[in-house]
């Protein structure tokens, strides 16, 4: 799965090694963001001497609406929640930026009293014992989640479970959302369209943009994503 990572400078080796070193193995290669796959089909056939079947589809089960806005981030989130487009996942490219936005959004009234009470009941038995725990609990009680690789796994899982129950209006996180996390996000909001790739700051690749934005409007949860 996620075969588009084959071309990644750092992670691609995990996909390249088995294909190149196990020629007698049958592979099922899947990705939602690959373009022309003729090269891979021909290469696999050369490696194992067997025909390669290509199955393609350009239809998305849940259509996406794209928009561009220059209004402040908090104002954009407030507007989307008011328009019924929550939960909103706000994509950042540093953990600090994600946490800063979560704090900023506490000034908004994103969740109703009933929704806040539901979150409070859901996390009543959760122990927020780490130094960062009380801050996370404060945000969650406002209907705001934080999600990135720097959090303890139990906190990330908690945010995912609350999101699956529809108890969070906004989630501030990094592009970890684009890596195999199945949460019912209706709207994906990019805080910016460039990121530091370890060497330089560059505009997001089309692959990264579609991988992340494609998490909006999940089948079985929404009729449309934003």
Give, region by region, the residue ranges found by the protein language model.
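Conserved ATPase-coupling elements of RecA-like P-loop NTPase cores
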Residues: 3-16, 39-40, 155, 181-184, ...
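Flexible beta-alpha connector loops of hexameric P-loop NTPases
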Residues: 4-9, 28-29, 65, 145-152, ...
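Conserved C-terminal RecA-like helicase domain
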Residues: 96-170, 198-209
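Walker B catalytic acidic pair
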Residues: 1-3, 174, 192
